[in-house]
Structure formats: C-alpha cells, structure tokens
C-alpha cells in the first residue's frame, strides 16, 4: 500500500522523538536500578524488537517504553513504569491517540497493580485540551512538548 510522503515524514518524526525520549530516560532508569525496555531486539523476547505486554483481559499491547525492576536483556522484570510517546502534527486525531494510549495502558496497569507502576505519556506537537484532560483524569502523568 502506497503511503504519502507526509505520512512517511510523520513516522520518521515520531521515531526520532521516541529515540530522543529513550535517551532521556536511560540515566533515570540507571539511577533507579531499573531495566529500560524499548523497541530493540531482546533475547528474552526471542530477539523480537516489539515491547509487548498483556493486559488483564488477555490482550497484547505494543508499548514504547517500560521500566522493569529486576529486568535484564535475558529476563523480564516487574513493570514499574509504562511510558507512551506520541507526536501529532494536527489536533485532528489527538483525542483518538489519547484514547488509544489509555485503552492500552490502563488494563495493563490494573493487572500489575501490586507493582504500583507509574504510567505516563510524552506528547509532542498538537494535542487538544480534551485529549490532555482525558489522560490526566485517568491518572496519567503527561509531559507536553511544543505547542
């Protein structure tokens, strides 16, 4: 399926943003003695790049960043933080993205409640106040870059 140059550019911007955020979180994870998981080949996933966790309903969700206690390249740890990263050029689909983030993260957090995981979103670009308010009302810590 053909993709427009604008769509491809948006994907590149999103991937660059995610890589930059991962580098910002790396020293935090080290300081807290947490394993930082992100999209990369990991032996405990049989070399699969995708960070995927299962929610309380048995649904699998691909995630951006997970910090794990007692995790390593060869062993999955206990989740201590779930962080999603998103970029939007226009506000048109920002509410949908907020709903997608909360729909993935909240059922996972419920399943790992005993670990008291942090959950947040790093959002760049244009997001409506209602999209931001929804995430905040659901307990997300939100960092907004730009606007």
Where are these regions (language model features)?
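Interdomain/boundary linker segments immediately adjacent to catalytic/signaling cores
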Residues: 1-42
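Active-site metal-binding core of divalent-cation-utilizing nuclease and nuclease-like domains
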Residues: 37-76
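Catalytic micro-motifs at enzyme active sites that drive phosphoryl/nucleotidyl and oxygen chemistry
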Residues: 51-56, 69-73, 108-110, 121-132
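Conserved catalytic cores of phosphodiester-cleaving nucleases, focusing on short active-site segments
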Residues: 65-67, 80-89, 101
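Active-site-adjacent loop/helix micro-motif of nuclease/hydrolase catalytic cores
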Residues: 75-77, 89-100, 130
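"Short basic amphipathic alpha-helical interaction patches in structured regions
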Residues: 80, 96-102, 134-138
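Short, basic/hydrophobic alpha-helical segments
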Residues: 102-113
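Domain-level recognition of nuclease-like catalytic cores that cleave nucleotide substrates
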Residues: 117-147
């Amino acid at each position: 399926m053909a993709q427009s140059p604008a769509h491809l550019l948006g994907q590149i911007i999103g991937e660059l943003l995610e890589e930059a955020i991962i580098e910002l979180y790396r020293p935090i994870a080290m300081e807290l003695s947490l394993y930082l998981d992100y999209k990369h080949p990991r032996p405990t996933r049989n070399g699969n790049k995708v960070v995927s966790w299962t929610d309380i309903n048995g649904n699998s969700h691909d995630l951006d960043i997970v910090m794990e206690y007692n995790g390593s390249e060869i062993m999955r740890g206990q989740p201590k933080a779930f962080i999603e990263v998103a970029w939007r050029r226009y506000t048109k689909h920002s509410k949908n993205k907020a709903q997608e983030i909360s729909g993935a993260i909240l059922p996972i957090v419920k399943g790992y409640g005993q670990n008291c995981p942090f959950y947040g979103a790093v959002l760049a670009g244009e997001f409506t106040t209602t999209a931001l308010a929804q995430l905040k009302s659901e307990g997300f810590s939100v960092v907004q870059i730009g606007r």
